[in-house]
């Protein structure tokens, strides 16, 4: 089977890292990129140099309106570059892009993302939560994808991708009665470098580098969409903190069946080494956030930081590279749905 051909709309943090993940994994072929705000020579620069994940360990250049991205031992990606503001005008079909990653953060509903299908794409994967597109989390519910009907899908959020695999393992083994999640989350591009206006969410407009900022997140409630048994049982919030990348989920839950911390560690480790290998990881090391920069897992369970009050009330800690781990799952989701074509 030939590799799925992919287009990327929006060459921001996630768009560029999806391309990096695609080059590393060598499982999909990126054939087109669209961004109306970035010239092709600037794309080369932004892709080559990354303050968080380091310099791209390969070659990147441009020839006419094509980006040429290569890495030793991997396939070269010859990528047609478009600069269209209207997604309906992007010629995905003529570039051969069957699967489009919608990573602008703008076209996140079925109606808006549908414009990509007009340009010749067959499937659209939104790299953000969606109000109405079905959400799939690799390792949790990706097998519920329906090729005949699911043309526009969401890869959910980075936080849902961290929380859902852990919640699945705990719920499958011990049952979750209810739970609260907090994510201590790295800054993202929507935040302000210094205090500024921010619509109705006044706290979100405060300086990202100087504050711990309480913020809302739908990530915990979204777990109920990907694990229906947990619908209505989880909610959560976020603290935005002044770090550039890597976040951590704290899941505090009441369990149906009593469990010791060792019981929990055992089932999480078994899942990380078995059915959720590559998605969920397990560590007993004395780690901190920078230890997970560029980690490709969705969720890394921190056995040493997790605690229990009693056998039915637990606090579980799991790390995630909110940029790169998530981008790897976008590529994995495309690889999976392509097998159903």
Swiss-Prot record:
The active site is at residue 158. Its EC number is 1.2.1.12. GO terms for cellular component: cytosol. Keywords: Cytoplasm, Glycolysis, NAD, Oxidoreductase. D-glyceraldehyde 3-phosphate binds at residues 157-159, 188, 217-218, 240. InterPro entries: GlycerAld/Erythrose_P_DH (IPR020831), GlycerAld_3-P_DH_AS (IPR020830), GlycerAld_3-P_DH_cat (IPR020829), GlycerAld_3-P_DH_NAD(P)-bd (IPR020828), Glyceraldehyde-3-P_DH_1 (IPR006424), NAD(P)-bd_dom_sf (IPR036291). GO terms for biological process: glucose metabolic process; glycolytic process. NAD(+) binds at residues 13-14, 35, 85, 322. Pfam families: Gp_dh_C, Gp_dh_N. SUPFAM superfamilies: Glyceraldehyde-3-phosphate dehydrogenase-like, C-terminal domain (SSF55347), NAD(P)-binding Rossmann-fold domains (SSF51735). NCBIfam families: GAPDH-I (TIGR01534). This is Glyceraldehyde-3-phosphate dehydrogenase 3.1.
């Amino acid at each position: 089977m030939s590799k799925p051909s992919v287009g990327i709309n929006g060459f921001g943090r996630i768009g560029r890292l999806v391309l990096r993940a695609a080059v590393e994994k060598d499982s999909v072929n990126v054939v087109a990129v669209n961004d109306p705000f970035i010239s092709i020579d600037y794309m080369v620069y932004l892709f080559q140099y990354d303050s968080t994940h380091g310099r791209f360990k390969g070659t990147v250049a441009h020839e006419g309106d094509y980006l040429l991205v290569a890495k030793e031992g991997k396939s070269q990606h010859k990528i047609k570059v478009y600069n269209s503001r209207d997604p309906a005008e992007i010629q995905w079909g003529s570039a051969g892009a069957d699967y489009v990653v919608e990573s602008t953060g703008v076209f996140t509903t079925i109606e808006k993302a549908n414009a990509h299908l007009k340009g010749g794409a067959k499937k659209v994967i939104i790299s953000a939560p969606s109000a109405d597109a079905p959400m799939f989390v690799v390792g949790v519910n990706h097998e519920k994808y329906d090729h005949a009907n699911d043309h526009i899908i969401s890869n959910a959020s980075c936080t849902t991708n961290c929380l859902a695999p852990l919640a699945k393992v705990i719920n499958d083994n011990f049952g979750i009665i209810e739970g609260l999640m907090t994510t201590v989350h790295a800054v993202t591009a929507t935040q302000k470098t210094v205090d500024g206006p921010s619509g109705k969410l006044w706290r979100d407009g405060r300086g990202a580098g100087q504050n711990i900022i309480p913020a809302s997140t739908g990530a915990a409630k979204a777990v109920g969409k990907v694990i229906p048994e947990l619908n209505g049982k989880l909610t959560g919030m976020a603290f935005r903190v002044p770090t550039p990348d890597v976040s951590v989920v704290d899941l505090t839950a009441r369990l149906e069946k009593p469990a010791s911390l060792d019981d929990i560690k055992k089932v999480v480790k078994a899942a990380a080494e078995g059915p959720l290998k590559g998605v969920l990881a397990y560590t007993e090391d004395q780690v901190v956030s920078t230890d997970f920069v560029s980690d490709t897992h969705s969720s890394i369970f921190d056995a040493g930081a997790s605690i229990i009050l009693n056998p039915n009330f637990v606090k579980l800690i799991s790390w995630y590279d909110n940029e790169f781990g998530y981008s790897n799952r976008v590529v994995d989701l495309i690889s999976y749905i392509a097998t159903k074509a």
